[in-house]
Amino acid sequence: MQFGVHLPHFGPFVSREGLRRFAQRADALDFHSVWASDHIAWPQHIDSLYPYTTTGEWPAHDPWMPRLDAIGTLLFVAGCTERVRLGTTVLVLGYRPPVQTAKLWSTLDVVSGGRAILGVGVGWMREEFEVLGMPSDHRGARADEQLEIFERLFAEHAPAYAGRFYRFPPIGFEPKPVRGRIPVWVGGHAPAALRRAGRAGDALHAAHVSPETLAGQWAEVRRHCAEAGRDPGAMELSVRLGLDYAGTSARPNALSGEREAMLARITEYAAVGTSHLLLDITGDSVDGLIRDMERFADEVVPALTH
């Protein structure tokens, strides 16, 4: 199993130095990947329900909390690391025009030496779409078109597109990603998201779900993959979970407790088919996050990677 960690790019302790130290330590500890989440503007009042808590309340809602841009964060981290992969958990496709998004990602992939992972989702906060001046209707259909556009921009010499929501004439789009394309990890748990993952993704990137729920989602993704004429065996399964040694996380299914309890729980996810685990570490300082990352790397990772 491979392990990734969420970068400390939001919260009261955001800083250039803290971000650099955390990312470089993750790189040195041989974590597979580091990840950034995508929010741009936080309305003071939100009626939209957050899909990953039982109450629908968003644990991170604080309009004045410092938050660095996801792609800008990854570009910075690309410049101060050498090996670790760089992903979004997840990039909300509807927040940006697709050609602009593709340019940002091809840039990240080139300057990082081919380390980008494009984790995508359709978003849930209607109010943020409104603040950004972007439509929030038909989010799934728009996302499907965006993924088609990315494929063309990354592969074709003079790509063009004419869809229901997006269109552009033949254009030049260079440089291409280092390996010709960027892996797409599809987030979400709705039936449409699972269908999208199976038909257009390289991985399902689930979040805060139990092994039992994940098993059902994974079966659906593999079914859609086969129906689309793709190889389900080539798909990857990733799940994002809290890592909370203090036992204070508000997120469901967070990993907590001592080493043996964590190993047993992670083994349940592995039995479902999980090949990648993204750790969302709970803490109140960068030093604390690094200590917990080091502890996990020392106590848990060796038992699951050898």
Stretches with model-predicted labels:
Residues 1-306:
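Active-site-adjacent structural elements that line small-molecule/cofactor binding pockets in enzymes
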